[in-house]
């Protein structure tokens, strides 16, 4: 009888150790390759034109270094057959972009499996502790084995992290037109904590302007920003150039 209990205990402990790291192992396998996705909030339709000159104004107000981004966008635009010029007055198109944020983000709506992984480790600890019911003669020792099994799962989960970096960029495209374009600008300027000043202005020009937001995601297990940065920049450059 005692031998049977010991065999059952060994089998249960072995199963717990095997299962405790299953969440981490599953994550490591599924997310071993870098996945990059880019989405544009609005489609921009430009009129067909024979003019092929583009002026670029690329800004970065995030806390990450994006010093090479303008060069990548310029290369992508040139690859589409356009000429990048330094004078806005000589350009048929203007491309203005600002990187608002480039950081690790928790996309809870699509990555709920991360929380379930941690729950798996805790369940492993509780299951291991329950072995005491099979061996009342050494409850303390068996409890220690069960908790150790759970801690193995927690340690495995801690070593495997599903990381998603997101880059958010606002983009404005302007194209010249033969028509006269009248633009009314309205701005609400805050005055202290309880007031605001409404400022309006009207200008006349020869450009149609369009705005959109580009969101790029890089996802991989234990991903570092240094690895995510170049692919995020490449995806943004490709997305912007494909508007033309």
Swiss-Prot record:
Its main location: membrane. It is a lipid-anchor. A lipid is attached at residue 22 (N-palmitoyl cysteine). Residues 1-21 form the signal peptide. A lipid is attached at residue 22 (S-diacylglycerol cysteine). GO terms for cellular component: cell outer membrane. InterPro entries: TraT_complement-R. Responsible for preventing unproductive conjugation between bacteria carrying like plasmids. It is found in: Cell outer membrane. This is TraT complement resistance protein. It comes from the Bacteria. The keyword Lipoprotein applies. Belongs to the TraT lipoprotein family.
